[in-house]
Amino acid sequence: MRIYVNEIKVTEDSINCYTEQSTEGLQEAGQMLVDSDNYSFAYILDDGQSYSYLIFVQETWSMLYENKGKKLIINDELELKQFENEFNYILDNIQGNSNYGKEFVSVVENTFELD
């Protein structure tokens, strides 16, 4: 199941993301995928039987970047403790890597100010 982050509220110490679909019973799997065709990042969540994909579309990226280092909490209940490490790993992999497509790489590099 694809679960889209459709609202973000930032506090002093956290990024609070909200979705229309429930995330109850889901836990982070600690992996992130890239959908370069749709300009999104998909963080994998697990309910013990199947995976769901928490989708961060391009419009959410600047909020993630501007507030990096803060706790990421989904629907006020699920803290993604491994998100930042996984996200940094993905960004390092994307930087200068044309396998993701030149335009996607360029947008990611500009948004996240990758050198």
Curated annotation (Swiss-Prot):
InterPro entries: UPF0738. The lineage of its organism: Bacteria, Bacillati, Bacillota, Bacilli, Bacillales. It comes from Staphylococcus saprophyticus subsp. saprophyticus (strain ATCC 15305 / DSM 20229 / NCIMB 8711 / NCTC 7292 / S-41). HAMAP family: UPF0738. Belongs to the UPF0738 family. This is UPF0738 protein SSP1780.
